[in-house]
Design a protein with these regions (language model features):
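Conserved N-terminal beta1-alpha1 strand-loop-helix module at the mouth
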Residues: 1-90, 107, 156, 167, ...
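Catalytic cores of alpha/beta
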Residues: 34, 77-87, 120-128, 145, ...
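Glycine-rich phosphate-binding active-site loops on the catalytic face of alpha/beta enzymes
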Residues: 91-101, 134-144, 178-200
């Protein structure tokens, strides 16, 4: 899967809902009900970050839930790509971009949403064929004003900004012409996960899925 094909696949996923939940899950036993709650609320594309020992098992469990598309986030090395695929991930997300990660994704045919924070990084990825990128860490590197400015000289690159995105500021990102969707953790906060408040998470997901209405 070359970069052009990867970006086409990622773009189709980004257009399924305005928000991709960025999930940090410690307990694989709650993976399925968490996924079901988010999907019920209208968020069907789920990013499970590889930040916990159980993350790969969480991906495997969430992949069993109908109606969702589960990917692996926080891919930081080539071996993560193989592990993610073996766990059942259908796409990958990286905070930054290295040759090793991009090559592994191409060889293993895993669509990747590669991370970039500067115009130079964005241009390098675009020249490789990645027309859809993760803008990270969005708020820390200038937020919506920076992303809007980048769209001037680089109008053909589309983004999923992530990092510091909240329900309160998500809409202003989504109204930018170069933003396809946003990544956010607010739809599945730690306290609701720990309390197994699936109804509460569904409500947050529903509000996020309807944020542009």
């Amino acid at each position: 899967m070359n970069p052009y094909e990867a970006s086409k696949k990622i773009e189709s996923l980004c257009r399924l809902a305005p928000v991709i939940p960025v999930l940090v899950v410690d307990d694989a036993n709650i993976a399925q009900p968490l996924a079901e709650a988010l999907i019920k609320g209208g968020l069907t594309v789920l990013e499970v970050t590889l930040r916990t020992p159980s993350a790969l098992q969480v991906i495997s469990e969430m992949a069993k839930v109908q109606g969702g598309v589960v990917g692996a986030g926080t891919i930081t090395k080539a071996s993560d790509v193989t592990d993610a695929i073996n766990a059942g991930a259908q796409f990958g997300v990286s905070p930054g971009s290295t040759d090793d990660i991009l090559e592994a994704c191409e060889q293993k045919k895993l669509p990747i949403l590669p991370g970039a924070a500067t115009s130079t990084e964005i241009m390098k990825l675009f020249n490789l064929g990645f027309s859809v990128q993760k803008f990270f860490p969005a708020e820390a590197v200038g937020g919506q004003s920076a992303l809007k400015a980048i769209g001037g000289p680089l109008p053909h690159v589309k983004f999923c900004p992530t990092g510091g995105i909240t329900y309160q500021n998500a809409k202003s990102y989504l109204q930018l012409q170069n933003t396809l969707c946003v990544g956010g953790s607010w739809v599945a906060p730690k306290n609701l996960i720990e309390n197994k408040d699936w109804h509460g998470i569904t409500n947050l997901a529903k509000a996020a899925s309807e944020i542009l209405n």
